[in-house]
């Protein structure tokens, strides 16, 4: 049966659940072509869900199991190790993609930290059961991830969810859904789609109508002062970077999907341990910084400093061992040619000044680390 392009895009939301397990990589300061920080892939949660009857959350959990019945065959057919998930879903449009990323950040900033943490932990567990040539998680973990994401989405006002949907649709070539569907059993894809629609209705029943207030942001703290110093020293370097380049979408040389997944898992664990208010503040700082980005993809000096301060506070809220797990995992997956290549594209004096300032900032953050 022929589906409209828009309906086919909705079908991709089923795949999004597993894509979160296998493909999503988030960094603290990525280019406009990547999803921003932990906030982009995070979705949202709500106080309203916490105060609702226990059966409220169970209804989403039960619906997730039914979705699993309808979609797991489809999930097993998707090649989650395919490099296609690194590509733009159509014409490369960095600044347009950034608008979609911004909507994701806004949605993520509405998250209840407890539900966000639960979703991250569900993803971590699901990564542990990934197996087979296609890199699919177990059926039980598939259900648990979908349930966690359903609760997260239910905690966000519908308009925020639709903002993400609409903005992603604008940068997605209309031929993409049909192509992706051609890679799996059409019948299984249709069954998954119908299951997703039923799941969507259950989630929508519990959806909140308003988002929580903004995060609290410290002022005059040592990390904030150090972030200002870092930003002043590194802003010339920042302005020399080509943020609109497609290099950020290139796969790491010689690194398999499974190797990348191990590094991604360390990031998810770190995100799950971070302070919820600090994460929210970092997402809000990124959102504001996106608003001041110029035609070259560079944010204002003030917003750059605010983002650095926010990220410093996030990192300080996580044990050093967890941060080093991320560092070591990424170092092991990064060929030595990559830093040299990136270094060659900017003024080396400015790059060295930025690095020196970063090490000083790192020491201040570490001193505040729990």
Curated annotation (Swiss-Prot):
Cell compartments where the protein resides: Plastid, Chloroplast
Q: Where is the transit peptide?
A: 1-57
Keyword Protease tagged: no
Q: Name one Pfam family in it.
A: PCP
Gene Ontology CC terms:
chloroplast; light-harvesting complex
Ranges of the sequence repeats in the UniProt entry = 58-220, 221-370
Q: Any domain commentary?
A: The mature protein is composed of 2 almost identical repeat units.
What this protein is reported to do is described as:
Water-soluble antenna for capture of solar energy in the blue-green range. Peridinin is an asymmetric carotenoid.
According to the record's subunit comment, the protein's assembly and interactions are: Homotrimer.
The molecule here is called Peridinin-chlorophyll a-binding protein 1, chloroplastic
What is the protein's species of origin?
A: Amphidinium carterae (Dinoflagellate)
């Amino acid at each position: 049966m022929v589906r409209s392009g828009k309906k086919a895009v909705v079908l991709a939301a089923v795949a999004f659940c597993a894509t979160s397990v296998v493909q999503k990589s988030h960094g603290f300061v990525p280019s406009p072509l990547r999803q921003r920080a932990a906030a982009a892939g995070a979705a949202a949660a709500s106080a309203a869900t916490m105060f609702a009857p226990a059966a409220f959350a169970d209804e989403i959990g039960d619906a997730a199991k039914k979705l699993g019945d309808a979609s797991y065959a489809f999930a097993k057919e998707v090649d989650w190790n395919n490099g296609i998930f690194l590509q733009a879903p159509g014409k490369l449009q960095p600044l347009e993609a950034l608008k979609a990323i911004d909507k994701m950040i806004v949605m993520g900033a509405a998250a209840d930290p407890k539900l966000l943490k639960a979703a991250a932990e569900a993803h971590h567990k699901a990564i542990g059961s990934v197996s087979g040539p296609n890199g699919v998680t177990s059926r039980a973990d598939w259900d648990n991830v979908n349930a966690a994401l359903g609760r997260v989405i239910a905690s966000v006002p519908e308009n925020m969810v639709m903002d993400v949907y609409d903005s992603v649709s604008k940068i997605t070539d209309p031929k993409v859904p049909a192509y992706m569907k051609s890679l799996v059993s059409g019948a299984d894809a249709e069954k998954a789609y119908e299951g997703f629609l039923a799941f969507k209705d259950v989630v929508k029943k519990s959806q909140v109508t308003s988002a929580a207030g903004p995060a609290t942001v410290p002022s005059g703290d040592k990390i904030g002062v150090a972030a200002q110093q870092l930003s002043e020293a590194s802003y010339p370097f920042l302005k020399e970077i080509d943020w609109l380049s497609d290099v950020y979408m290139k796969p790491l040389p010689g690194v398999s999907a499974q190797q990348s997944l191990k590094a991604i898992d360390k990031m998810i664990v770190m995100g799950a341990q971070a302070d919820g208010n600090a994460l929210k503040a970092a997402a809000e700082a990124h959102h504001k910084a996106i608003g001041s980005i110029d035609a070259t993809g560079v944010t204002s000096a003030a917003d750059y400093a605010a983002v650095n301060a926010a990220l410093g506070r996030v990192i300080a809220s996580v044990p050093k061992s967890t941060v080093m797990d991320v560092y070591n995992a990424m170092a092991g997956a990064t060929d030595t040619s990559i830093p040299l290549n990136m270094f060659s594209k900017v003024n080396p004096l400015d790059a060295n000044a930025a690095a020196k300032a970063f090490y000083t900032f790192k020491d201040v953050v570490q001193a505040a680390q729990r």
